[in-house]
């Protein structure tokens, strides 16, 4: 028989060693015996015994031989028996080096798994490609060390339980040796259920839950466990490319960020928290880790996605399905919490959406703290000296899901997930080219930095702990936003939405977009390659054409030159792209509105400017992420630095403020923020004669009806603010202003709030007029240039 390759670690050095051979076929045992013969030849004075490792689900009788080998009296003396080394050994089978995507898919078929070939296939491999067979040895441990670990961590006392413990430790050591050869992408937690159920810590917590049983906890662990397999890992990239086949095949990464993250992941376990705009995100993160040969992530997902054949496949590739509503199930909450802690303790990486669900508006949602609190508990309990919260920014040039999101905004119901839904989703990915997928990894946030050392004060102060969690989560989200590149899709959509259906020529699009690009360059904001191409007319044409045919831009070619516009029915879809870039223009938009407010303010206009900037920040806090108050003021001051002696000019007021705004490039508030205040104003108008404690569903229905009336009357600029998604945050604003609760002066305060919003909308009108004057001046200058040619 041709000799197989042997791993460098598969060397025995101890004088007395028990080799535990994990084998599935006689061929594998032959290979291990051949390897053991080599070890004996190298160390003739050492004693090597070999025992076949019982399978995981073997009956108790199968452990008898191992029980005897572990007995202190089995060796020449009890002491020498305890000093005996245990070394697990197995044969791993590598897949063919030139395997295609089709080959990876075919591995799902019975008898085609390259990692677990049949005995007949094994003999053929040894004849034709013996390098695919590797004898590997796991890390050794003394019997005394294993016995002490067993006593310290489990509730078991019987010698047969100790043998089971040693078996599990052997299999775990082999798994570590295996992924060192196969690659970090194959690293996964093994034997989670038996390890946790045998844990003294887990059983003690279980005893404190009324009515809880080990059997019920075991069923929940079965539901959570991933059942990881190498074939499924290989399929992650195949399925990921299938689900994203409408995009460029190569994801766009920042190589410096990838290198920094790789170094960080070598030091600490991490939770990868990704922005969530599409179901595709669920495959982007695993594929990104594989692309860059980084350790895999164990993705949390709603159990609603565990359907058909996809459920088992996703589970075996690292997906952890969790129930949606667990508030009234203390046992499930406990099992989930302990499962998260166990995975973190074993230094595996977790991942989920920091927003908890897809953002259907294009902007980031507030972070959800549910799973984060479990990770924090694991850290504070000392299961790791630090845990990194690694933000992941995922953005797209285009998404086919915006049609669905636009329907949601108009009040449609969510389509339930299922096989038909999955088929339609994957089918839609191949209908056209959607551009690139951009993946960014900003600097990770240290849990230790925000929560202090393990076992610290926060363990005894739930309120302080929750506040620290909120600050930590917002910091992760803030870093995600700062790393998210601005796309051409977002800039073009934002510009065309401001025209309210009026078409623009290529030259008009090009010269108007340059101010935004100049601003992003000054601020050193990250931009996509598609946005960089907007510097040229060809790049603008490519971006506008990519959005044409109702995706969501309409192109008209019947005249002297093509023109582009957004039809009313496509405004909600275009708004998704526009909202994805607001973060880059948020503070400069607030500056414009604060200047407009100061123009008609009485008294100290500088003070009025600052007061209004802070007020706008407060009103918008449910829709957008902001820096803390001190940093926000510093950012606003930096935004004003473009105008020399701005406070002096602001204090004069009148035409000076007009001149300041006219000189500002770009003017973005109308494009970026008007729609949100229009939605707030619609809700405020509904509240004028609504019951004090009106419910969210009734408020939304009334706002939709009134909003449609306002669109018909021209009282709002477009149909975009008439959105269930925007009304949801508008209601949060109203609750924050204490306008949805009985009070003696409620009616007066509701009227005052609507008046305040109308005054803000008046400021939008003022800034918009100046922006139009800028556009006319640019257009006049451009025409003069064309006339000279």
UniProtKB/Swiss-Prot annotation:
It is an enzyme of class 2 (transferase). InterPro entries: GPAT/DHAPAT, GPAT/DHAPAT_C, GPAT/DHAPAT_LPLAT, GPAT_PlsB, Plipid/glycerol_acylTrfase. Its main location: membrane. One of its GO terms (cellular component) is plasma membrane. GO terms for molecular function: glycerol-3-phosphate O-acyltransferase activity. Keywords: Acyltransferase, Cell membrane, Lipid biosynthesis, Lipid metabolism, Membrane, Phospholipid biosynthesis, Phospholipid metabolism, Transferase. Pathway: Phospholipid metabolism; CDP-diacylglycerol biosynthesis; CDP-diacylglycerol from sn-glycerol 3-phosphate: step 1/3. GO terms for biological process: CDP-diacylglycerol biosynthetic process. It catalyses: sn-glycerol 3-phosphate + an acyl-CoA = a 1-acyl-sn-glycero-3-phosphate + CoA. A motif (HXXXXD motif) lies at residues 276-281. Its EC number is 2.3.1.15. SMART domains: PlsC (SM00563). NCBIfam families: PRK03355.1 (NF002886). Belongs to the GPAT/DAPAT family. PANTHER family: DIHYDROXYACETONE PHOSPHATE ACYLTRANSFERASE (PTHR12563:SF17), GLYCEROL-3-PHOSPHATE ACYLTRANSFERASE (PTHR12563). The HXXXXD motif is essential for acyltransferase activity and may constitute the binding site for the phosphate moiety of the glycerol-3-phosphate. This is Glycerol-3-phosphate acyltransferase.
């Amino acid at each position: 028989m041709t000799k197989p390759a042997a791993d460098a670690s598969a060397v025995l050095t101890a004088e007395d060693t028990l080799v535990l051979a994990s084998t599935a076929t006689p061929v594998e045992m032959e290979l291990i015996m051949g390897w053991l013969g080599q070890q004996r030849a190298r160390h003739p004075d050492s004693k090597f015994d070999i025992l076949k490792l019982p399978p995981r689900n073997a009956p108790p009788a199968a452990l008898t031989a191992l029980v005897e080998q572990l007995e202190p009296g089995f060796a020449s003396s009890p002491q020498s028996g305890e000093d005996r080394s245990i070394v697990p050994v197995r044969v791993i089978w590598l897949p063919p080096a030139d395997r295609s995507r089709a080959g990876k898919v075919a591995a799902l078929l019975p008898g085609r798994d390259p990692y677990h070939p049949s005995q007949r296939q094994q003999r053929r491999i040894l004849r034709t490609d013996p390098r695919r067979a590797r004898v590997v040895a796991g890390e050794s441990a003394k019997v005394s060390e294993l016995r002490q670990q067993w006593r310290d961590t489990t509730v078991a006392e019987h010698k047969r339980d100790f043998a089971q413990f040693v078996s599990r430790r052997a299999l775990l050591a082999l798994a570590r040796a295996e992924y060192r050869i196969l690659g970090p992408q194959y690293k996964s937690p093994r034997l989670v259920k038996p390890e946790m159920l045998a844990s003294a810590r887990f059983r003690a917590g279980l005893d404190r839950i009324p009515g809880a049983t080990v059997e019920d906890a075991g069923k929940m662990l079965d539901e959570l466990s991933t059942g990881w397999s190498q074939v499924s890992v290989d399929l992650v990239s195949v399925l990921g490319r299938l689900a994203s086949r409408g995009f460029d095949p190569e994801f766009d990464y920042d190589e410096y960020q990838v290198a920094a993250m790789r170094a960080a992941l070598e030091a600490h376990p991490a939770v990868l928290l990704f922005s969530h705009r599409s179901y595709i995100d669920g495959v982007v993160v695993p594929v990104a880790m594989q692309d860059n040969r980084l350790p895999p992530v164990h993705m949390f997902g709603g159990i609603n996605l565990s359907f058909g054949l996809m459920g088992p496949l996703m589970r075996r590739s690292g997906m952890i399905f969790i129930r949606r509503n667990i508030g009234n199930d203390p046992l499930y909450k406990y099992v989930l919490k302990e499962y998260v802690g166990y995975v973190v303790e074993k230094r595996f990486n977790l991942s989920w959406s920091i927003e908890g669900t897809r953002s259907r508006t294009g902007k980031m949602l507030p972070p959800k703290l549910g799973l984060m609190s479990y990770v924090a508990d694991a850290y504070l309990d000392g299961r790791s000296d630090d845990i990194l919260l690694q933000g992941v920014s995922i953005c797209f040039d285009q998404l086919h899901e915006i049609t669905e999101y636009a329907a949601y905004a108009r009040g449609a119901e969510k389509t339930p997930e299922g096989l038909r839904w999955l088929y339609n989703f994957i089918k839609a990915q191949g209908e056209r080219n959607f551009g690139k997928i951009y993946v960014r990894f900003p600097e990770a946030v240290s849990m230790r930095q925000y929560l202090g050392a393990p076992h610290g004060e926060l363990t005894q102060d739930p309120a302080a702990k929750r506040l620290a969690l909120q600050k930590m989560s917002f910091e992760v989200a803030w870093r995600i936003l700062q790393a998210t590149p601005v796309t051409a899709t977002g800039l073009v959509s934002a510009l065309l939405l401001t025209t309210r259906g009026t078409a623009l020529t290529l030259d008009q699009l090009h010269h108007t977009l340059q101010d935004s690009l100049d601003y992003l360059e000054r601020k050193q904001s990250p931009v996509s390659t598609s946005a960089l191409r907007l510097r040229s007319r060809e790049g603008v044409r490519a971006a506008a054409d990519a959005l044409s045919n109702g995706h969501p831009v309409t192109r008209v070619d019947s005249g002297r030159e093509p023109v582009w516009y957004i039809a009313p029915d496509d405004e909600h879809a275009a708004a998704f792209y526009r909202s994805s870039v607001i973060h880059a223009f948020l503070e400069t938009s607030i500056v414009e509105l604060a200047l407009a407010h100061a123009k008609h303010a009485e008294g100290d206009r500088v003070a009025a400017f600052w007061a209004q900037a802070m007020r706008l920040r407060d009103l918008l806090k449910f829709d957008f992420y902001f820096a803390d108050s001190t940093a926000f003021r510093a950012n606003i001051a930096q935004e004003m630095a473009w105008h020399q002696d701005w406070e002096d000019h602001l204090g004069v007021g009148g035409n000076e403020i007009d001149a300041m705004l006219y000189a500002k490039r770009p003017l973005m508030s109308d494009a970026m923020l008007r729609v949100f205040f229009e939605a707030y104003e619609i809700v405020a108008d509904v509240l004028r004669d609504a019951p004090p404690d009106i419910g969210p569903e009734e408020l939304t229905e009334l706002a939709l009806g009134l909003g449609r009336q306002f669109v018909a009357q021209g009282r709002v600029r477009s149909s975009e603010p008439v959105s269930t998604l925007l009304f949801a945050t508008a209601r949060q604003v109203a609750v924050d202003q204490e306008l949805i609760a009985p009070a003696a002066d409620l009616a007066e305060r509701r009227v005052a709030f609507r008046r305040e919003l109308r005054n803000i909308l008046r400021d939008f009108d003022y800034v918009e007029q100046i922006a139009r004057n800028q556009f006319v001046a640019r257009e006049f200058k451009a025409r003069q240039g064309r006339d000279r040619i």
